[in-house]
């Protein structure tokens, strides 16, 4: 198709690691727009390895079922779908600094 690549962008829009309509529109519109390769955001391979609680996940078959819908749509538009696999390492966090804690500060007792 072409060499235009949509690089992974953290969207922080998943619930329990599942892609949703936001991802369908965000990624699908890039495929419709003509990009040759469209990569998802960083997808955690285990729930404890997420960068944030709102990250995309691929630690269960159910996650792949949802992602397959998006991938089939993008492929139907002529784009090659891809995924960025991720693990945040020893600094991984499933703590959100936003709800009720706008500073994002974690007390030492909490981790």
Q: Where are each of the predicted segments found?
A:
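N-terminal capping/small domains of soluble enzymes
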Residues: 1-88, 95
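Non-globular sequence segments
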Residues: 72, 86-111
């Amino acid at each position: 198709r072409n060499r235009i690549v949509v690089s992974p962008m953290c969207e922080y829009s998943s619930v329990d690691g599942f892609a949703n309509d936001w991802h369908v529109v965000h990624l699908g519109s890039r495929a419709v727009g003509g990009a040759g390769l469209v990569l998802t955001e960083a997808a955690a391979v285990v729930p404890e390895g997420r960068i944030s609680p709102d990250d995309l996940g691929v630690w269960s078959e159910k996650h792949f079922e949802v992602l397959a819908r998006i991938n089939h749509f993008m492929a139907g538009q002529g784009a090659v779908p891809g995924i960025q696999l991720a693990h945040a390492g020893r600094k991984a966090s499933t703590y959100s600094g936003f709800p009720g804690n706008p500073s994002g500060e974690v007390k030492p007792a909490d981790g």
